[in-house]
UniProtKB/Swiss-Prot annotation:
GO MF annotations, alphabetized: phosphatidylserine decarboxylase activity
EC identifiers of the protein: 4.1.1.65
Pathway: Phospholipid metabolism; phosphatidylethanolamine biosynthesis; phosphatidylethanolamine from CDP-diacylglycerol: step 2/2
Any one Gene Ontology BP term: phosphatidylethanolamine biosynthetic process
Cofactor(s), names only, from the UniProt record: pyruvate
Protein name per UniProt: Phosphatidylserine decarboxylase proenzyme
Major location (coarse): membrane
Catalytic activity entry: a 1,2-diacyl-sn-glycero-3-phospho-L-serine + H(+) = a 1,2-diacyl-sn-glycero-3-phosphoethanolamine + CO2
Amino acid sequence: MIKYYNRKTKNYEIEKIAGEKYLNWTYNSPVGMTILEKFIKKKLFSKIYGLYCNSKISSYKIKKFATDFNINMSHSEKSFNDFKSFNDFFSRKLIKSSRPIADNKNFLISPCDGKIIVYNNINMNNIIQVKGITYKLNDLIQNDSISKTYEKGTCIIARLCPTDYHRFHFLDNGICESTIKIKGNYYSVNPIALNKINNLFCQNKREWSIFNSDNFGKILYVEIGATCVGSIIQTYMPNKKVLKGMEKGYFKFGGSTIVLFLEHNKVIIDEDILTESKLGIETKVLMGERIGTKLN
């Protein structure tokens, strides 16, 4: 059971997890863990499932998935009959009015839909994955000099579950450098897995880039793949000016995670998010929503 905070209703809610029984069996049983280590975490498994999700035959499951998880299709640019495959539906674009951007230049926005948790004043050698499990930033991006930039900074973890909108965006005006790709495994990024696998983010396939933002300094974007995420697609043009809210890229099928690192004294995170984060509880947010304010 995963409890999160809905800041709009100011209530706690329980996340409806796609494939919950499968996840619990895989990560909490000896047989499941054996199959996970031998096959499921490997690229081949995600590649095979990705081929299925790209096929026309996979489109039959779209309506049921949307109904089961209460996905608001009025926000989608396409209707059910327009999707060519499940991946086409999964990486769907939304109409702009469904995700208004908090456009005040001093507002830090969420780059995606998902559940976020925030850690301030981080120790780059002891970053929290979940309570009791930590990792090193250098292990995550494999670049020691850049890692040192974010000592005592802010870490924002945005977890996208399979039912979320899976495109991610720029949280300010600025220029993003080229993406660095790191090969890895394909563990789930669901809290069920995060509580079982040490250094999970540092083991999974991931990509990172430096975003030179106009108002929040150098922001480190890290996109982390997961089980069945066949691809992380970067759609932006490196070293070209982008505007707040513009698309950076998208994930193909599967749950995924974006981890953001901001330098020390660049942002004050909204109090409700900080309060829940201190309790170890994620907060539900939508892309474009304010999550913090520039520290002057």
